[in-house]
Regions:
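Short strand-connecting beta-turns/loops that link adjacent beta-strands
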Residues: 15, 61, 72-73, 98-102
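Beta-strand/loop substructures that line and gate deep hydrophobic ligand-binding cavities in soluble
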Residues: 82-132, 139, 148-149
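Hydrophobic ligand-binding cavity/cleft-lining segments
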Residues: 1-44, 160-171
Length: 171
C-alpha cells in the first residue's frame, strides 16, 4: 500500500520544555486532542518514556500507541501497535528552541491505509485532527505560561512574558 505523510510545524511563545511536558503526559492528552487517552503501561525509566503504551479512543476507533524513542525536551517517537484503520503508523514529534521564550514543534506522521483508496481521506482527517490539537495545545501552553509570574535575578520584580503571535504552518 501507498505510504502517506502528514507534517505540521507550529510555533509557540513558550520554552520547549513546556510543550514537551504537555505532549508527553499521555494521561492528559485528551485536553488537546478530541479523544480519550489512558496510560496502559508505564515506560522506563520515565513513566511516559520508552515502552509506555497509551490507549486512544477516538470516535468509533480504539487503538494503542507505544513510545519507541524518547529524549526529554527533544523528541518523542511512537507507533500504533494495535487497532486503528491504518498500518505502519509512526509519529515523530521534535521540539526545537527558537529563543528562551519561543519554541517549535515539528510533528510528522507516516501511515498506510488498511483499505486501498482511503489514504487521501485518512490523511485529511489526521491532518485536521492534529492541527486542531496543536492549536489547542499552543493556546493552553501560552495562557498558562503567560499567567505564571517569573522573577528576574537582578530586580527581584515580577513580570509576565510578552505576547507574540502564534504561527501554524501545515506542509
Amino acid at each position: 500500500m501507498t505510504i502517506h505523510t502528514v507534517t505540521l510545524e507550529v510555533t509557540a511563545n513558550v520554552p520547549k520544555k513546556v510543550l514537551f511536558a504537555l505532549l508527553s503526559d499521555h494521561a492528559k492528552l485528551g485536553r488537546f486532542f478530541n479523544a480519550q487517552y489512558t496510560l496502559v503501561r508505564s515506560g522506563k525509566p520515565e513513566e511516559n518514556g520508552i515502552g509506555a503504551i497509551r490507549e486512544v479512543i477516538h470516535g468509533p476507533f480504539t487503538y494503542q500507541e507505544q513510545v519507541i524513542d524518547y529524549k526529554e525536551n527533544e523528541h518523542i517517537h511512537y507507533q500504533i501497535i494495535h487497532g486503528a484503520p491504518v498500518n505502519e503508523h509512526g509519529g515523530w514529534i521534535k521540539f526545537t528552541s527558537i529563543n528562551a521564550t519561543q519554541s517549535q514543534i515539528h510533528y510528522h506522521i507516516t501511515f498506510s491505509p488498511k483499505i486501498k483508496g482511503t489514504g487521501w481521506l485518512l490523511k485529511y482527517q489526521i491532518q485536521h485532527f492534529l492541527k486542531q490539537a496543536l492549536n489547542n495545545l499552543i493556546q493552553h501552553s501560552e495562557d498558562v505560561w503567560q499567567s505564571t509570574p517569573t522573577v528576574t535575578p537582578y530586580s527581584h520584580t515580577t513580570h509576565e512574558q510578552d505576547a507574540i503571535s502564534t504561527k501554524t504552518r501545515a506542509k
